[in-house]
Structures are given as structure tokens and as C-alpha cells.
């Protein structure tokens, strides 16, 4: 039987994973399925790094997934998932070791609430830009309420009631939300893409000859790069 690598070897291996954000491959991002993976490392801080993860890691104003690991008939909860080079699942219990095979059950209610909130944020951002030329400069999403930071050309013209009415119109229209993989030329020439200067900076940061960006389209109202769930 081949022995499992040492802790140091696991740390090096986990760092080299440069893990793919598997959640990007699932759209819609609601009702995420459970998945099975191997524990690559349990860090000194109590974080679990898996061979692969379909969890959404905190980023872009959207909180990370939470959930439960299932192993040998017992459950071990994990807190909000984060990511740097690898995706980390903070353990809220004990009982996992390198090499364990686990089933990861993502909290669906939390994910679904955040996905809906993220889509609503896209609508609010688009309406504010369409009506008053506002640019979204920040946000923080949560399951019950969220914050949007809007920079206006003329703040005095802003009408909160009008924003609410317009945003609710699009929500009630139940328009489709589509995901595309586009290159620079298609992104920069499409009239539906707003704030192209900012978008071009994202493309440059991704790098490569023709980087493909994940574009989220709320039909009829918004089209922008986004790695969140919808």
C-alpha cells in the first residue's frame, strides 16, 4: 500500500493545484449537487483543501458557500469557503485527515438566496446606469439584504422609488439569465457591455493571447463579466 505524502508534501501539492473554480461550470448556480472529493490537506488553521471543489469561494461581494462533509455516516460542518491559490473549507468540527474521501453537501438554501441576490444586484446596477449614468463601484451581498455602492454623475437626479419600480419590473418579467464565454473582440464590440474601460482592465489582468471571460447576461438589461452564481 502506497503511503500518503507527508504534511509538507501535501502543502506543496495543494499550492500547486491552482484549483479550477468548478462552480463556474454549473449554470444555473442554484440547487448545487453534492460532490465527492479527497482531502488533500487539513491546514494548521483547520481549513480543508480538497482534490477539487464545486463550492463558491467568497469573492466579488458574494459570500462563499457553507455546508457539510459526510464521511463514514457522520457529518462535519464547514464555514464560509474562501480561495487564493486553492479553495479552503474552514472546518467547524474535527475528524478529517489527509487522504479521506468525503461527500460535500453545499447549503442549498444559502446558495440559492445568494444567487438570486446576485442576479438582483446586476439588475439594480444596470437600471441605475441606464437611468442616471451611475457606475457600481462596490457591493456586499447577503442572504437577507445587500448593499450597492453607486457613483452618480449627478446625485440630485437619483430617484429611489424609480429605481425600485424599474428593478421590480425586470424581476417580475422573469427574464432569462445566460452565461457566455467570450473573447476580447466580442466583448469590446458588443453594445450591451457597459463600462468598457473597466472591462478591458479585467481582460488585461486575466492575460493571454485571447482570454475567454465568463459573461453573464440578464436578457434585455445587463451583460457583464461575472464569476458569481445566478
Task: Show which residues each predicted segment covers.
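Active-/binding-site microenvironments in catalytic and ligand-binding cores
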Residues: 2-230
Amino acid at each position: 500500500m502506497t503511503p500518503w505524502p507527508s504534511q509538507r508534501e501535501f502543502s506543496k501539492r495543494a499550492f500547486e493545484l491552482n484549483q479550477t473554480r468548478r462552480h463556474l461550470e454549473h449554470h444555473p448556480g442554484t440547487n448545487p449537487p453534492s460532490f465527492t472529493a479527497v482531502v488533500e490537506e487539513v491546514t494548521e488553521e483547520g481549513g480543508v483543501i480538497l482534490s477539487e471543489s464545486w463550492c463558491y469561494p467568497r469573492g466579488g461581494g458574494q459570500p462563499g458557500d457553507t455546508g457539510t462533509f459526510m464521511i463514514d455516516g457522520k457529518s462535519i460542518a464547514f464555514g464560509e469557503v474562501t480561495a487564493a491559490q486553492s479553495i479552503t473549507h474552514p472546518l467547524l468540527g474535527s475528524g478529517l485527515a489527509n487522504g479521506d474521501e468525503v461527500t460535500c453537501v453545499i447549503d442549498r438554501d444559502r446558495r440559492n438566496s445568494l444567487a438570486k441576490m446576485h442576479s438582483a444586484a446586476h439588475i439594480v446596477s444596470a437600471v441605475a446606469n441606464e437611468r442616471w449614468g451611475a457606475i457600481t463601484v462596490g457591493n456586499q451581498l447577503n442572504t437577507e439584504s445587500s448593499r450597492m455602492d453607486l457613483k452618480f454623475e449627478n446625485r440630485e437626479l437619483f430617484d429611489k422609488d424609480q429605481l425600485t419600480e424599474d428593478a421590480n419590473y425586470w424581476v417580475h418579467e422573469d427574464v432569462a439569465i445566460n452565461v457566455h464565454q467570450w473573447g476580447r473582440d466580442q466583448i469590446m464590440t458588443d453594445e450591451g457591455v457597459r463600462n468598457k474601460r473597466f472591462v478591458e482592465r479585467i481582460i488585461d489582468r486575466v492575460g493571454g493571447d485571447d482570454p475567454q471571460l465568463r459573461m453573464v447576461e440578464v436578457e434585455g438589461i445587463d451583460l457583464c463579466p461575472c464569476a458569481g452564481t445566478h
